[in-house]
Amino acid sequence: MDRHDTMDFTNEPLSKKRRFLGDQGDSDHVAGGPSSSPQFSAPPSSPPRKKLLQDPNSEVQPRVSKDADHNDDDDDDDDDDDEERPRFFTDDGTLTPHATKICAPWLNDMPKPDPRKGYLLKDVDTPIATPRDVAPPVVESPQLAFDKDTFEAFVGEKVASDILHVISKNCGNNIERAVNMYLDGTWKKLHRAPPVRVNSHSPLVVGGQSPKKSSTSQARSRSHAQAQPQPQSNTPTKVLPSMPDARYVGAFGVEGWATRSGTGLLRHGDSVKIERQKIQPPTVARKGQTKPGTPQSIPRVSAAAAKRVDVIVRFNDASGRELGRLAKDTANWVSTLIDQNICRFEGICVYAPERLRTNETVFLQLKCYMLRSAFLGRTLQLADNRAAGFHEKDETTEEKDLRLRQVALVRLFQEINIVPSRGNAAAAKDARKDLLEAADSAEKKAMDKAKAGDHNTNGLASPPEEAEEGQELEQDQLDALYKKAQSFDFSTPEAEPANTFAMTLRPYQKQSLYWMLAKEKNQRTEDRETSMHPLWEEYVWPTKDHDDKDLPVVPDQPCFYVNPYSGDLSLDFPKQEQHCLGGILADEMGLGKTIQMLSLIHSHRSEVAIKAREAGPTSVNNLPRLPTVSGQKTTIDAPCTTLVVAPMSLLAQWQSEAENASKEGTFKTMMYYGAEKNVDLVTMCCEANAANAPDVIITSYGVVLSEFTQLATKNGDRLSSRGLFSLNFFRVILDEAHNIKNRQAKTSRACYEIAAEHRWVLTGTPIVNRLEDLFSLVRFLRVEPWNNFSFWRTFITVPFESKNFVRALDVVQTVLEPLVMRRTKDMKTPDGQFLVPLPPKHIEIVDIELSEPERAVYDYVFNRAKRTLFDNMQAGTVMKAFTSIFAQILRLRQSCCHPVLVRNQEILADEEEANMAADVAAGLADDMDLQTLIERFTATTDDASKTNNNFGAHVLRQIRDEAVNECPICAEEPMIDQAVTGCWHSACKKCLLDYIKHQTDRNEVPRCFQCREHINIRDIFEVIRHDDDLETSSTPGASPEPRISLQRVGANDSSAKIVALISHLRTLRQEHPKMKSLVISQFTSFLSLISSALTRHKISFLRLDGSMSQKARAAVLTEFQSTNKFCVLLLSLKAGGVGLNLTSAKRVYMMDPWWSFAVEAQAIDRVHRMGQEDEVRVYRFIVKQSVEMRMLRVQERKKFIATSLGMMSDEEKKMQRIEDIKELLSSD
């Protein structure tokens, strides 16, 4: 007899109805403890029961859904009326007369139960959207004793005596349990299974071995076992040797809706399969073919892909035919658990209409099983290092999966009503609420971005190299954050460096050394009690399922652990790791961060390094064996070596300072860059080679990234590379650590993976302009729990973006305070002295007046940019066209430096080629040595040109001998700034130029004032006497003669800034023949033009920019430091903004302004820093009545707004950006 043919939902035995409903009632029962009888309730978020219990003559209206799949074979049934079915309960929860009649034999003497309230989800603040406002009836049932006749009346057939004996023996004298055991066949297993008992008070030992456990975890296991009630029956418990493929964790009720129509498709008690269709992983569109072995970057989630997210979860019958789908609210998170191989689900129908219609509501109970794969670690992945836009906050696929995983786990535990077995349940509830709010915030941000499309709403900052995230901090907020970090206690004890350190530290440096030593030596004692990691939660595996049946147990695995912030699961106890043994040295630039770290390296060595140093060199016969790797160890210890990661331009400086700060023979440094990388670091730095291991390895961020990329292609096999990631260093130091401020960049990810006992970062700006800048440093330092981005986002980012600034900034200050040591140059000691007594620094603005040709070019670019702004303002598209307007403003700034920078380079090259050809034909050049010209003219033997050459030679000799000669135009004697025409006639430079202008103004072709030959401005040469070269003469006893040259008039006048610079440098060379200077510009093409001018004027110079190799940079810096002659260093703003020590220079020339003066100040501080002994003068070249003057005004106004108005809304910021653009393109 098929039980489905004899029973329906309304007149079925109470025990059969109860066993298919969820175990939601008792928290003790859900957590794993037994209950006297199983509890049940309606599915989640069901409305009042009376809506389900409709009039027998009424018809249930189906929902309308676009996604419904109709079964055409059953369409004929849809036209029939519903059968009238007897009601089992009234609206107030009491039994109907029909039910009373059926149950009279055993309910006459029973007390009437109270109505049961509808089921509501616990710990869920927002109601779940359900497809229908219906719910199955719910009622409490009294417990009945087992009786043979009553039992057979319930099951509807005679039962053999041996079966009755087994059931009565194992049902605990409970008729409900007896009926359930008979109907689901449990009695058969009990009849055959051998009795196996488990002692819940002590863990079982499988295979004769038991894993070692700490005293704390053993005590925890004992207390947990004692808290578990003993089973009420003698049902045997199955013992598993290890974690099975899937393990039961709980059950819960859900709603679904049918996608088929027909009779008998789904009935109460039927099992259904919960399935997902296979989804395709996102692909990255790339041009061309990807090379084999190239690691794939994590794809970013596009707006279109975000809209196509498939969360459909289907329930199918045993044959695989789809019957319906889960409600969307439930499917949202159930689909995530299935897709990410965290859980699998089994379904049982609780309620379905006898004749099912499309879109009709079905109630299911889902049993959830945690998969073993969910407890396995995740593999190493790369991040996308490309910038998708200005300050774009794209969410990577990995981060989206993490967010969905977090929400899914939290919702699952809420549904099955499982709570942590350790810790404060109320605190856990609040933390989950905050985590869901953070996830909702991230989801809302992603949706807003998808709606916004590609609209560019960026500020006036220059385009960054990497996509950044988070709201920008205003200046007053930054000041508030640094206030605590900079409240330095001058009473801090001092520490003396080791005797191998060759330098003398200042008092404030000795105090920081004491602080750093204290941070590194704060080791956790071995006997300290092991505590659980604060981000993890402990949960107890259930020992009974929703039917109150015993579940299989795994010895020594009574609990599992969940990190709701990272979505990780573990079967092992997550220990609280030792807190950060390092920190952030954030002293302002010029206070000697490098020297302080070197003193730490000398003063704190590992025990292995100390013993190796005391033992001295080891003989070959006594060399220890090289290490072998066993077990799960992935790196080899390098107990004697500190790794320093710095920008490429600072590698040589680190090596030089490390050698200078160490006594001879006490310190070994190694450069790990370029050709020097061809070494086996594992063999060189391992403990077996401690006596010969380098004390410091210096490498660049680029090398770290390169080896990290290779590591990813090898699936994270660290030891195979024998490089940086194969070692666990004693210490790692990141210099200029703001290079890793973007947590999503590959460089940042690579640095996070460096293994080291102690971790330090050096930066003058821990927070550049976003709170996420600090998070990246905290993650590198591995500061628990803040290095978890989900935790950071929950307690810092979301409150800040929700305008709860006080809470967010207070939390950040608590993070900063124990980690950061920061001093500034304007700090004073208690006796009123500056920390570092530096010589004065004077900054002077040099006003530059553009020449007429330059002004013409500038006005053309200015009018075009202004017209573009006006057109977009009229159309209301200023922010859309911001990139175009910004590019035109950039061209405007370049025109202030040199008109050539904004001209078409191909046309310019053609013009220069034509001019050079004309000069070759005439024997002329921009810069000609007078003596060479005389010798050339004298050596001419051609009779046709001999006369002219003799005259030219005669004129040149007069110039050389300074023969008295008056100007033929103004009669001034001697001539003022003597100039020579191409036909070798002389006059005052100003007179000659005015004479030519007078003729061109009258539209006449200029002619020579003496011989009437045609002349032009390119044929006018100025006589230059190089008096400043006298001191370079090396001939002893000879009277020095100045070098004389003829330079084409206007060759240097094409740029007013270059003319001013040359004038300053020539004057400086006359006054200080051995002084060194810096010339800084953000445009490397402008530096090339300056270098040409310096060459023409015989001014010695060197150049350093980002295009140079590390060896070339090191050579330039060494030469600049060692030369004792007048020298100029041409420096690009980016290359000179970090880390360099250029105290040998005394003058700084800033050729063009940057958007923020703080960037210029970084470059200036390369000169004005500790070690500078002379006064420093800075000259900022600013063109009058230009965009450069207005840039300075915008900077000042923005500082005022930041400090006086504080945080502005997004709309206010947008308006401010437009005002900034208007200001830049306004007319003075």
Swiss-Prot record:
GO CC terms in record: cytoplasm; nucleus
Residue pairs linked by disulfide bridges in the UniProt entry: none
Compositional bias (Low complexity): 34-43
Biased composition range(s): Polar residues: 211-237
InterPro entries the UniProt entry points to: Helicase_ATP-bd, Helicase_C-like, HIRAN, P-loop_NTPase, SNF2-like_sf, SNF2/RAD54-like_C, SNF2_N, SNF2_RAD54_helicase_TF
Short sequence motif DEAH box: positions: 735-738
Domain (Helicase C-terminal) ranges: 1060-1216
Main location class: cytoplasm
CDD domains attached to this UniProt entry: DEXDc_SHPRH-like, RING-HC_SpRad8-like, SF2_C_SNF
Coiled coil start-end: none
Function: Probable helicase, member of the UBC2/RAD6 epistasis group. Functions with DNA repair protein uvs-2/rad18 in error-free postreplication DNA repair. Involved in the maintenance of wild-type rates of instability of simple repetitive sequences such as poly(GT) repeats. Seems to be involved in maintaining a balance which acts in favor of error-prone non-homologous joining during DNA double-strand breaks repairs.
Official protein name in the record: DNA repair protein rad5
Record carries keyword ATP-binding: yes
Compositional bias segments (type: Basic and acidic residues): 445-454
Top EC class, one word: hydrolase
Biased composition (Acidic residues): 70-83, 465-474
PANTHER family: DNA REPAIR PROTEIN RAD5 (PTHR45626:SF22), TRANSCRIPTION TERMINATION FACTOR 2-RELATED (PTHR45626)
Organism: Neurospora crassa (strain ATCC 24698 / 74-OR23-1A / CBS 708.71 / DSM 1257 / FGSC 987)
Keyword annotations: ATP-binding, Cytoplasm, DNA damage, DNA repair, DNA-binding, Helicase, Hydrolase, Metal-binding, Nucleotide-binding, Nucleus, Zinc, Zinc-finger
